Amino acid sequence: MTLAALPWGTKALFGSISDSVPLGGYTKRYYIVLACIMLSAVAGVLASAEEISAREAAGLFCLGNLAICIVDLLIEGKYSELMRTRGEGRSDIVTFVWLMVMFGGLLASVIAGPLADQGIIQPLAWGALVMALLPILPLLFGWLPEEKQVGCCMTGKLRQNRGIFFLALVMSLAAFSIAMATLFGSSYSKLFTSLGASLLLITIADKTLPPVLSSCNLFMFVVEVSSISLGGALQYFFVAPETCLADGPHFSYVFFTTWASVIGAFFGLLGLMIFQWRLSHWNVRKIFYLTTFLRIFAAIFDIAMVQRWNTNELGIDDHTFFVLGDAIVSPVISMISFLPLVMLTSKLCSAGLESTTYSVLAGFQNLGSIVSRSAGSFVIGQLGMQTTTCPYSFDNLGTGIAVCNMAMPLLVIPFARFLLPNARLDEPLYEWFQGSGDLRSALTSDEMWLANTSSGSEEEDVVTITAIEKIAAENQEKIEIDERDLDL
């Protein structure tokens, strides 16, 4: 699974390549076409192979995930661009994209789940082949809005934004190092490798990213790290057979992986609609305060099941209580917590570098998740939980959830006060920050001098912003002239 998930850690590298090297004059269209062809080829091999080894399957899933993460990244870059140029900071685009993602997940759970449970795998692979080819037609018809670029390599963009490109390269190398530590090392080595990579990347980000981008990026990393994942132990607790855990829920895999996922996908859609209708206009800090307390509330359901309060104290059977908590409440809260991160990430993307910037920001969030899971594995071992041989032991799991999923997330609150903007989520943050979130990521020394001479008065700040925009436009013209000269 580590090898299969490796491409998601290298998204920043592919974002840099697509932003700086147009393919056929486009930075997204033909990259997505090639990714769809690659994914269909992987599905075709899986569908037609009579027998396949574990290593071959891991390699194929790695290629498949590479294709999926390229499509995912480039679409994220495109809707980040549309939010800046057309959306005026509104959440409609993000909500629509994730509505489609959630609907697709719901459809996949309904169709693929029951078939996979019955061992019907190859027909699913043939279906995946067809689905992988479907996006190619609208792309070739030009339905993805994108202007054709001049030149085969945007060397001016590379020179002007070498800091973020360097960060993207280091991030990809760090992801590879963590994958190797996971494959060949212990839980300790994975934890220390991920922590070391995090500190290195945070330091580089502080030096190469604009202050606003760097501080918001650090906050999103802290959000992921603050809720230490004990999901591995919880999954064993839920599905452990009676022979290994006498007083457990004893869920079947069909219920746990299929039907709970179907219910969860439906209520995830409900969470998306609640965010769009009620929360998308909230203050950035306040919405993260709210989501922090909601995540803490969701952890109560897991503690209640682990401590058996639902059956012994409340008289609610395990299946009903699990559906109420993990399949209804948790998906709603997860979506409400997730969408503000997506909105903030999209708003902070630099013009012309949407894929690179998004991949770097999302990469830090993924890195935070890796640290969270690594720390969770360490905590599970330290608390003496036994999940490898029968009988299983989860005596300290409730305490672990209380500390890791209820106390630790409270650390986010002071970080939100100092690292996040005091603005509404639907405001165009790149304007609210006087250019810092968008324009400043490409400022030259002249522009930085102007930005630093702002006195703080509204009238003079407007003059400063206008001057910065003028110089930035002139610099962009120079870059385009240089690129045309190189092409000639």
Where are these predicted regions, by residue range?
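A membrane-interface helix-boundary motif in multi-pass transporters
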Residues: 25-33, 114-132, 181-193, 283-287, ...
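C-terminal ends and interior cores of transmembrane alpha-helices
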Residues: 33-52, 293-316
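Hydrophobic/aromatic end-of-helix segments at the C-terminal termini of transmembrane alpha-helices
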Residues: 75, 79, 229-238, 242-246, ...
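Intracellular juxtamembrane helix-capping segments at the cytosolic ends
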Residues: 68-84, 334-356
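Intracellular loop-helix junctions on the cytosolic face of multi-pass helical membrane proteins
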Residues: 41, 50-52, 56-57, 84-235, ...
